[in-house]
Amino acid sequence: MNMHKTLTCVYLVCIFVSKSFSQDSPFVTYPKKTSDYLKRIQTGKAKYKYNPNINFKEWQIEARKELSKIIGLDKITQDLEGFKPSIIQIKEETIDDKYIRTLYHIETEPGIQVPFYLLVPKNRQLREKHPLLLSPHGHDVDGLHSYAGAYINKSHRDKILGRDGNIAEQAVLKGMISIAPATRGLAKEVLIPDPKGRHGNRPCRAQLMHCLISGRTPTAERVWDMQKILDWALKDSRINREMIIMTGNSGGGVLTAYTSALDERIKVSLPSCSFTSITSNTGYIFHCDCCAIPGIKDWGDFRDLGGLIAPRRLLIVHGIKDGLHSKIDVERTTDAIKAIYSDRNASDKMSMRWGKSGHKFYPDIMWPFIQKALAGISK
């Protein structure tokens, strides 16, 4: 009898898990009236949807140009014409005699100081050129400290190490130079306050609202910051310009996707728990408000961001237990990107992998891909 009950429980669990990841079950459903409305307005013109029958390089140039415009990056560039970022060093320390971690502040636009950590392996010959890993974080107010292994206290350390979140520190311990920057609107150092809780007591949403009325988006601000940090970093003779890697989890993954699509200096891109279609097939919006781009569906979708990254190295990683994303929508998007890479005879440079857990980094998947990518670049 006990054995029968046990087998019944196992069967029910299997059924539950099967249904949870069923390709036939929609991630979210809406009432028909709402569903019809969303389907009608969200279809979009998808003007820059990838088309295998057009000139690929010309498509990339035009799609990239328009993307820069609609996110507001062009406006930031125009508004800041003549502005020169400045950098100050805040603190330098040697960690366990293994690497040097230096905190900098970069003024990316007037009055905006974006902190970032630079991690450099210790006791390396200065003439040796290193890969560079750039790793913006997502919704973590201590994000740059988390990624850099600069923990606030023991609780913070245990939390981050428990989910493999010290990605910039992992990189430097593997002999790379790494940068862990604050993500504007998400790190406590560069938040936009939400007085009176008008925007739901969410600084990232407050950032979005202030950006929208100014003709820009948080995504544009964040891409701009990453590009200014890259401009500075690539003046360092120790960095191999052909081995620039970018990764981030969640909102940091979204930023990785957009930066990689817009900036060809990124040679290896690894967006984690973030790279999926803008909406589900029923109209559900997957990403945070602060990632919203007005009119993006008239431009295209994440599939086309992947097309702008092609044929550079791209690994898309998701957690199978991540409740923020839909397996069917992730795979629909990544299958379309695989087809683009196949058209470019670059199938070996793109991969999609599922981690066994939830919304986190998967170093066991990421580092082998990075090592293989760097080996391919160095040939």
Regions of interest found by a model, annotated:
Residues A336-K379:
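C-terminal catalytic histidine-bearing segment of alpha/beta-hydrolase fold enzymes
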Residues E128, L134-Q227, K235, S280-I285:
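Cap/lid segment of the alpha/beta-hydrolase catalytic domain
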